[in-house]
Amino acid sequence: MTSPSTIKQKFIAKGHQLGVVAVGFSDGQPNQGVDPSGLIEAGLLDQLRDDLEYDIRHDGKVHTYAEFVPEHDPNHRGMKKPRTVSAATQQLSRQVYEHAREGRLVLTLGGDHSIAIGTISGTAKAIRERLGREMAVIWVDAHADINRPEDSDSGNIHGMPLAFLTGLAKDDNEDMFGWLQPDNLISPRKLVYIGLRDVDRAEKRLLKEHGIKAFSMHDIDKYGIGRVVEMALAHIGQDTPIHLSFDVDALDPQWAPSTGTPVRGGLTLREGDFIAESIHETGSLVAMDLVEVNPTLETLGASETIRAGCSLVRSALGDTLL
């Protein structure tokens, strides 16, 4: 039987409280159906409450932010639906900020990975205000998602969140991410990738130019997942709050087929769980995103993908094998 974690959380004032935001937003990419309802219906929040004994603070809604969508949203700098994504992520940023400011651990269930513009900006601001320090981001994904608008071939904003969050991409228009302020941003030095295997040429150049720490599947094959996680955490340092943003497509499609941009040669489910377990064991986790679960794609694999997503979240929040 699962029991609550005994790991003391260093940066969470209300360690028993879990702020949950469910986000059914998919306009950062072309596929509809990126929605956390399957995770919730599979009992994820019940498991976190009953087995891990979290006091769940959730409004019971899956937010689509449809009320914030403008009537007209033409492309801007090559970005598709920029005003829609900006408005949705600004609202999400406020929601995450409210939870994090209260000292709660925050779990956001997506939603495509563009929502990280909202989640990370909200957490970063709250951590600066509450603790007076910068946080780190561990981004577990097959993709780097750090394209600047002008570098993106697709124009889909789910491939750009880290460009905006690090300040490598900016826009002065309030309706198109101009609302992002310095206290919403993270330093490229505090960003670590794990699991990369489909990185655009312009993104590779940015990673090198800015000295961003990135561990690809080549590194995992070479060193093993244990050593890679050790190196990632050593880069961040022991006294740094961590926001974990986990794209389910980091897993090999064998384990998570129901996602919009699957790439073969990825993490096993155990490797994904190990990353999440190890971050929990640091006692430094302040927020987690799980994104890009889309049960409408590869419907025969939907239940497998949902089970994998639930496992990743439980592992990050203190579930153990023994």
From Swiss-Prot:
Residues given in the record as Mn(2+) 2 binding sites: 141, 143, 247, 249
Gene3D superfamilies: Ureohydrolase domain (3.40.800.10)
Pfam families per UniProt: Arginase (PF00491)
Name under which the protein is recorded: Arginase
Record-linked InterPro entries: Arginase (IPR014033), Ureohydrolase (IPR006035), Ureohydrolase_dom_sf (IPR023696), Ureohydrolase_Mn_BS (IPR020855)
Keyword Membrane included in the entry's annotation: no
Cofactor note: Binds 2 manganese ions per subunit.
Residue positions binding substrate: 143-147, 154-156, 200, 261, 292
Its EC number(s): 3.5.3.1
Residues engaged in binding Mn(2+) 1: 113, 141, 145, 247
Family membership: Belongs to the arginase family.
Pathway: Nitrogen metabolism; urea cycle; L-ornithine and urea from L-arginine: step 1/1
Any single biological process term in GO: urea cycle
EC supergroup of this enzyme: hydrolase
Record text on subunit structure and interactions: Homotrimer.
GO molecular function annotations of the record: arginase activity; manganese ion binding
Entry annotated with the keyword Hydrolase: yes
Organism from which the protein derives: Coccidioides immitis (strain RS)
A GO CC term attached to the entry: cytosol
